[in-house]
Amino acid sequence: MELSTAKKVVVFDYGFGNVRSAERALARAGAEVEITRDFDTAMNADGLLVPGVGAFAACMKGLKEARGDWIVGRRLAGGRPVMGICVGMQILFERGIEHGVETEGLDEWPGTVGPLEAEIVPHMGWNTVEAPGGSQLFAGLDADARFYFVHSYAVHDWSLDVANPAMRAPLVTWSTHGKPFVAAVENGALWATQFHPEKSGDAGAQLLNNWIGTL
């Protein structure tokens, strides 16, 4: 009997994400996928995907109630891969401000999630991104590849500098809707996208395949 060589990915189910869409996309990319909030399963998986839709404050509340904040922190402390999508990326920053109300995020990266600075909000539809050289997340993708966005809030400024030359600075990918905003981050074991790779056709499939390939 042959043992499966597929990487095990948990889609963390805390009530605020397109978990079924993510499950199908990851399975098509070759992963063994489970949707769960079970602590041990989430901790032991090769990769943990944290989706997110809706309000920053509601997502943070749901994540904490499911102990997801602790799971993410412990996985990253051990160098275990985590990927956030949409609001699942936003909550990795210091804070979010919605309608003047500030909510603390997971504080993995400095920065504030605020309203998009654009004439048309939400930003809904397909857009290109500007990925940095050396990106593993966007490997094999053309510069004109388009990804699907749907959001009203974003991070417009990146302020994390790495003073230690022995440490690799995070790779930040940008997109523009009115004003440039952070579209993706690659930071050691922690990767995240503002767009929805599971809804981004062939480009999104390649991106998820790239992530799974690093697990």
From Swiss-Prot:
Subunit structure: Heterodimer of HisH and HisF.
Species whose genome carries this gene: Streptomyces avermitilis (strain ATCC 31267 / DSM 46492 / JCM 5070 / NBRC 14893 / NCIMB 12804 / NRRL 8165 / MA-4680)
Subcellular location: Cytoplasm
EC number assigned by the record: 4.3.2.10, 3.5.1.2
One term of GO molecular function: imidazoleglycerol-phosphate synthase activity
GO biological process: L-histidine biosynthetic process
Primary gene name: hisH
GO cellular component, one term: cytoplasm
Glutamine amidotransferase type-1 domain boundaries: 8-215
Keyword Hydrolase in record: yes
Active site: 86 (nucleophile), 196, 198
Keyword Flavoprotein: no
Catalytic activity: 5-[(5-phospho-1-deoxy-D-ribulos-1-ylimino)methylamino]-1-(5-phospho-beta-D-ribosyl)imidazole-4-carboxamide + L-glutamine = D-erythro-1-(imidazol-4-yl)glycerol 3-phosphate + 5-amino-1-(5-phospho-beta-D-ribosyl)imidazole-4-carboxamide + L-glutamate + H(+); L-glutamine + H2O = L-glutamate + NH4(+)
Chief site of localization: cytoplasm
Entries under InterPro entries matching the protein: Class_I_gatase-like, GATASE, Imidazole-glycPsynth_HisH
Keywords attached to this entry: Amino-acid biosynthesis, Cytoplasm, Glutamine amidotransferase, Histidine biosynthesis, Hydrolase, Lyase
Pfam families: GATase (PF00117)
Known pathway: Amino-acid biosynthesis; L-histidine biosynthesis; L-histidine from 5-phospho-alpha-D-ribose 1-diphosphate: step 5/9
Gene3D superfamilies reported in the protein's UniProt record: 3.40.50.880
Record function comment: IGPS catalyzes the conversion of PRFAR and glutamine to IGP, AICAR and glutamate. The HisH subunit catalyzes the hydrolysis of glutamine to glutamate and ammonia as part of the synthesis of IGP and AICAR. The resulting ammonia molecule is channeled to the active site of HisF.
Protein name, UniProt field: Imidazole glycerol phosphate synthase subunit HisH
